[in-house]
Amino acid sequence: MKNYKKMKTKIFITGTSGFIGFHTAKKFLNRGYLVYGYDSINNYYDVKLKKARLDILKKYKKFKFTKGNLENKKTLNKSILRFKPKIIIHLAAQAGVRYSIEKPDKYLNSNIIGTFNVIELAKKINVKHLIIGSSSSVYGANTKFPFKEIDKTDHQISFYAATKKSTESMAHSYSSLWKVPITMLRFFTVYGPWGRPDMAYFKFTKNILNGKKINIYNKGKMYRDYTYIDDIVDGIFKLINKVPNNKQSKKYKNDSLSRVAPFRILNIGNTKKIYLLDFINTLEKVLKKKAIKKYLPMQKGDVHSTLSDTNLLKKITGYNPKTKYQIGIKKFINWYLSFYK
């Protein structure tokens, strides 16, 4: 701990054994930052994959890690107070729209109580900037595309989305009351190497290779704003010093900056409409194997389509996603074949 003052800004990242958290931590470590990771390493999906991600991070001398639940305030408190970070990037959450229908209590504990604990500690140590992962699922039943940050988000259709919307409201109230600078990031369908096995593209790849059926909901008549992980992480990296300040006059069109708090919501996506069947077709081409398709009705909790407007993030940071989904799929499959050989 004695040498920390000689290093760059300290970054505390929750969810470092998870998909986005792992890549985010790796980005900051590669840039010379000191990173403290925190994760429960739960068994929602393959623990071996989570540990493999962590093993890579642990090779960095500037990486420290504590295993713990977000709900365990004592462990979280000890980690943050000891490290005293200037930036907190809160990416840990119970993910998955469909699982939230089966186990809503897990989402209440991790996403709401856990996020409350992080925000409370951020207030306590007077952080420079708290960045919290939200989700495009908060747009719910909205039918006006692309989604803008200033759009109303009153009709979530999954409990997962409801917990994410709740964290946004909770964060805004804390930011208003205690002047904690907070940015909420609404992620749009993130994919890529080291991804989550519960996500459709991961399941599709596994089943196509094993000659098993893939379930295609709503007969494939839907689209997503698939966003490659490197573009997501680049956006997060560029954002850390862009601290919201409501005392300044708004500089941007359609700015989501709060009138009463140093609080802003930002979309982070690829801004491209990718139809599900086109995505599957690309998987088939790269794998050189046809999928056995099973068409099913729309599933509970799923939204029909998503599409981001990221003009605000672009104006603030210069964010410019560069990865075409065809290239991103190739990179994912190359990793998948290597990891599961």
Language-model features and meaning:
Residues 189, 193, 222-224:
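Heptad-repeat alpha-helical coiled-coil signaling segments
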Residues 2-4, 27-30, 68, 206-341:
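C-terminal substrate-binding subdomain of Rossmann-fold SDR/epimerase-dehydratase oxidoreductases
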Residues 131, 138-144, 179, 195, ...:
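Proline-centered turn/helix-capping motifs that create local helix->coil transitions or kinks
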Residues 166, 170, 174, 204, ...:
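Hydrophobic alpha-helix immediately C-terminal to the catalytic Tyr-X-X-X-Lys motif of short-chain
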Residues 1-190, 323, 335-339:
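N-terminal Rossmann-like NAD(P)+-binding domain of SDR-like oxidoreductases, especially those catalyzing
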